Amino acid sequence: ANAKEGIAVDWPIRYDDLAPWYSYVEKFAGIQGSKEGLEVLPDSEFLPAMDLNVVEKEVAAKIKTHYNGKRHMIIGRSANITQAKPEQNRVSCQYRNRCWRGCPFGAYFSTQSATLPAANATGNLTLETDKIVTKIIFDKDKKKATGVEVIDAVENKTYTYTAKIIFVCASSFNSTWLLMNSATDIWPGGLGSSSGELGNNVMDHHFRIG
């Protein structure tokens, strides 16, 4: 949008740069949907699409006829597998409306159903519970993050974990809070805050909040 409309700062990469990574994630997670060839909605690595119900099919047909095929009503694309993934011990969607409660069949993609089991299967996963990360440790000499400081919520003791790579995956607000709480004399506004934007213009996805 930035390049086409000539506004703001353009991205340094394009969709084609990200496409292989999108494909990798889509195949791993399992995305059902239909390939429509729409420029505004790029196709993905889809599993067979869920079917529209009778009413939806009727509405879709009328929309297509009314707009001479220029507008489409399609099934929503979602991370519900419609074909079993035995390598992940996941079975296809059972249409039980239990997605939001943590699908017991593993059909709806989640950390519990897919990524944690895959990580555990490598033999390189150590899962720590009751640990609250309070700070990312920044090594001034190496000029990189080298670990995290955590508080054990049960013992009320502080521990330090080191790693070659640190991933910050605590959602919008907690990730921002953690980076700000990791401020140093090099990064007084928070770790990585070179633009002054950290802590500002934060966006999050709220679900059913009045």
Language-model features and meaning:
Residues N2-V133:
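Conserved redox-cofactor binding core of oxidoreductases
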Residues T122, K135-K142, V148-G210:
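Glycine-rich loop(s) and the adjacent beta-strand/alpha-helix scaffold that form part
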